[in-house]
Amino acid sequence: MAKLHDYYKSSVVAELTKEFSYTSVMQVPRVEKITLNMGVGEAINDKKLLENAAADMAIISGQKPLITKARKSVAGFKIREGYPIGCKVTLRGERMWEFLERLISIALPRVRDFRGVSAKSFDGRGNYSMGVREQIIFPEIDYDKVDRVRGLDITITTSANTDAEGRALLAAFNFPFRK
């Protein structure tokens, strides 16, 4: 079991129950899933770019990504409906906890000029979204084998009802919010 999951069960649940005065342990917010998304717009011209992006995402997440396709044709972007334009992975359970642990303790501190992540990126329902400009902040990615530096979107979906609860949950995991 991931250390972060143990820490959640032993410390965070009690801490949040006390802070928000929940009557049941089931009311305490928990991380439900983490979604990683990588849009590869250049894949229209070169299919190899999408394969490389999917391989990078598989290394980062430990799971084979789903290739996302364009929902409708857009002449301005020169894409047609059904064209593969990105990839995504949904992490749950053990892999989710391991990824969150690596993100907080290893990957985010490796970002250049890192001063913390914005605390304003909550969606109003306690879910947190952030973008990473370079996939090379993850230690699993070999810098010499990267063909192009790509960014990815990370969405942390929680069972929290409000942004305050979601922020308290992530702050309890020592999530590096900007002061």
Curated annotation (Swiss-Prot):
The gene is rplE. GO terms for molecular function: rRNA binding; structural constituent of ribosome; tRNA binding. Pfam families: Ribosomal_L5, Ribosomal_L5_C. Keywords: Ribonucleoprotein, Ribosomal protein, RNA-binding, rRNA-binding, tRNA-binding. It comes from Aliivibrio fischeri (strain MJ11). The keyword Protease does not apply. One of its GO terms (cellular component) is ribonucleoprotein complex. Part of the 50S ribosomal subunit; part of the 5S rRNA/L5/L18/L25 subcomplex. Contacts the 5S rRNA and the P site tRNA. Forms a bridge to the 30S subunit in the 70S ribosome. PROSITE patterns: RIBOSOMAL_L5. GO terms for biological process: translation. This is Large ribosomal subunit protein uL5. This is one of the proteins that bind and probably mediate the attachment of the 5S RNA into the large ribosomal subunit, where it forms part of the central protuberance. In the 70S ribosome it contacts protein S13 of the 30S subunit (bridge B1b), connecting the 2 subunits; this bridge is implicated in subunit movement. Contacts the P site tRNA; the 5S rRNA and some of its associated proteins might help stabilize positioning of ribosome-bound tRNAs. InterPro entries: Ribosomal_uL5, Ribosomal_uL5_bac-type, Ribosomal_uL5_C, Ribosomal_uL5_CS, Ribosomal_uL5_dom_sf, Ribosomal_uL5_N. The keyword Transmembrane does not apply. Belongs to the universal ribosomal protein uL5 family.
